[in-house]
Regions:
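Conserved donor NDP-sugar-binding/catalytic core segment of glycosyltransferases
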Residues: 97-130
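Short, acidic, metal-binding catalytic loop of nucleotide-sugar glycosyltransferases
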Residues: 24-33
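Short, flexible, basic/aromatic active-site loop/helix in glycosyltransferases
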Residues: 134-177
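Glycine-rich, basic loop-to-helix element that forms the pyrophosphate-binding segment
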Residues: 63-80
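A short, conserved alpha-helix in the catalytic core of glycosyltransferases
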Residues: 168-172, 178-229
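Short aromatic/hydrophobic "clamp" motif used to bind/position activated sugar donors
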Residues: 85
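A conserved acidic beta->alpha catalytic loop
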Residues: 16, 25, 38-48, 65
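Active-site-adjacent helix/loop segment of glycosyltransferases
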Residues: 210-286
Length: 377
C-alpha cells in the first residue's frame, strides 16, 4: 500500500446535501485523494441524488441495508488501496491543509497509528469540540459516582477540563491522546494486523472509535491530535440516540473489560441506592435573554468558556478568550435542540472547581436544520 494518496471515506444516511459539502472540502484540500461515499440510506431517491451530485472522481457504494457507521467504513475501505484512510462525518468539513498536516504527522512518526485534526463547531474557529475520552470499566463506575456526589463530580469534571485544555492549547506539536473521534480521523491501515477490520461491525453506531483506539494502543501504536490540522464539525445534540449509545457501551465493556464487570455490578448497586443528582456542580440559572457573562478581573487576560449538554460538563465545547465579557453563542446554542445548556467560565490555568462559575440556560430548537443529527457520528 502506498503513502502517496489518501483514501477518504464519508458515510451517508439520508443527508446528501451535507455529504456533498464534506466531499467538496476533501477534494479542495487534496484533489488527488480517493473519495468513497458509502450510502446506508437504502433509498432509490437518495441514491439518485448522490449519483447526480457527487463529483466524477468520487466512488459511490450502495449498501444493501443500513449496516451502521463502522461496517460502512469497512465497506468503503475495500474501494481503496492506500495505507492512510481519512474518515469524515457528512456533517463535517476539512479546512485547507488538514489532510496534508495529518499525512505529514503519520509520515514523520511510524509509531502513530491514527491522528485527528482539532475540530471546530463553527466556521470562525472560535468554538472547539471536545477531545475524545477513552471509556474504561473503572472509569464508567467513577462517572456514576460523580453523578451522585458533588465532590466526585467536581474532581472528575476538573480532570476532564484539564484534558481538554491540553488538547485545545497544544497547537504546535502532536498532543498524545488515549482515544480519537471517528468523526474526523486519519488511520494507518498497516497499524492493524493483516485481515483485521478497521471497525468492529458489532458496533452499529457509537463506541466503534473507542474500540479502534483501544486496539491500536494494545498493538503498541500511539494516537495524537494534530493542532495544526483543522476541521469543522457541525455537531447537534441528539438525545434520541441514547438507546443506541447504551447498547454500544454494553458491547464495548463486555468486549474489553469482561474481567472487570464487577464495576458494572457496583454501578447497578449504586444506582439502586442513590438516584443521580440533577445539578451536581450547582449550576446557577442564567437570566432569560442574557447574551454576555461578566468576566472577573483576574481572568480577563485569558479565560475559557465551556458549553455542555451534561450537568457534569463532560464532555464540553470550549472557547478561549480574553477581556471583560464572554459572549454567549446564541445561534450555536440552538443546536442543543430544546435541551438545557450548561456553561462554565474560568481561567485557562488549572484551578479549583469552587473558583469556576457554572450556569444552566434553557435553549431553543432550530427545526430548520433538523436533518443534521441524522448524519452525526
Amino acid at each position: 500500500m502506498g503513502h502517496d494518496v489518501i483514501t477518504s471515506i464519508v458515510v451517508n444516511y439520508r443527508c446528501a446535501s451535507l455529504t456533498f459539502r464534506a466531499v467538496e472540502s476533501l477534494l479542495a484540500d487534496m484533489p488527488q485523494a480517493t473519495i468513497v461515499v458509502v450510502d446506508n440510506s437504502v433509498d432509490s431517491v437518495e441514491a439518485a441524488a448522490l449519483r447526480a451530485g457527487l463529483p466524477g472522481q468520487a466512488r459511490l457504494v450502495l449498501s444493501p441495508r443500513n449496516i451502521g457507521f463502522g461496517a460502512a467504513c469497512n465497506l468503503g475501505i475495500q474501494e481503496g488501496r492506500t495505507d492512510y484512510v481519512m474518515l469524515l462525518n457528512p456533517d463535517a468539513r476539512v479546512f485547507r491543509g488538514c489532510l496534508g498536516q495529518l499525512k505529514s504527522a503519520l509520515d514523520g512518526d511510524a509509531t502513530l497509528g491514527a491522528v485527528s485534526p482539532l475540530q471546530y463547531w463553527d466556521t470562525s474557529r472560535k468554538w472547539m469540540l471536545p477531545p475524545a475520552w477513552l471509556p474504561t470499566g473503572p472509569g464508567m463506575a467513577t462517572l456514576e459516582q460523580a453523578w451522585r456526589s458533588g465532590r466526585w463530580a467536581s474532581q472528575l469534571s476538573l480532570a476532564y477540563r484539564q484534558h481538554a485544555i491540553a488538547a485545545w492549547t497544544g497547537k504546535e506539536i502532536p498532543v498524545g491522546q488515549r482515544a480519537l473521534s471517528g468523526g474526523a480521523m486519519m488511520v494507518r491501515r498497516s497499524a492493524l494486523p493483516a485481515g483485521e477490520s478497521l471497525f468492529d461491525p458489532s458496533f452499529f453506531m457509537y463506541y466503534e472509535d473507542s474500540d479502534l483506539s483501544l486496539r491500536l494502543r494494545r498493538y503498541g501504536k500511539k494516537l495524537a491530535l494534530i493542532g495544526g490540522a483543522a476541521a469543522l464539525h457541525e455537531w447537534e445534540n441528539a438525545p434520541g440516540k441514547a438507546p443506541l449509545m447504551e447498547a454500544s457501551k454494553s458491547i464495548y465493556l463486555e468486549k474489553h473489560f469482561r474481567d472487570l464487570l464487577h464495576w458494572q455490578t457496583r454501578r447497578e448497586r449504586l444506582t439502586a441506592r442513590r438516584p443521580p443528582l440533577e445539578n451536581p456542580l450547582n449550576a446557577q440559572a442564567l437570566e432569560s435573554g442574557q447574551q454576555f457573562l461578566d468576566v472577573p478581573q483576574p481572568w480577563q487576560g485569558g479565560w475559557l468558556l465551556e458549553l455542555s449538554p451534561s450537568p457534569l460538563m463532560i464532555p464540553s465545547i470550549g472557547h478561549l478568550g480574553n477581556g471583560p465579557f464572554a459572549q454567549l453563542p446564541l445561534e450555536l446554542l440552538k443546536r442543543f435542540r430544546n435541551c438545557p445548556a450548561y456553561l462554565r467560565l474560568g481561567p485557562v490555568e488549572k484551578t479549583k472547581n469552587s473558583n469556576l462559575l457554572t450556569f444552566v440556560a434553557k435553549t431553543i430548537a432550530d427545526r430548520s436544520d433538523a436533518g443534521v443529527s441524522a448524519c452525526a457520528e
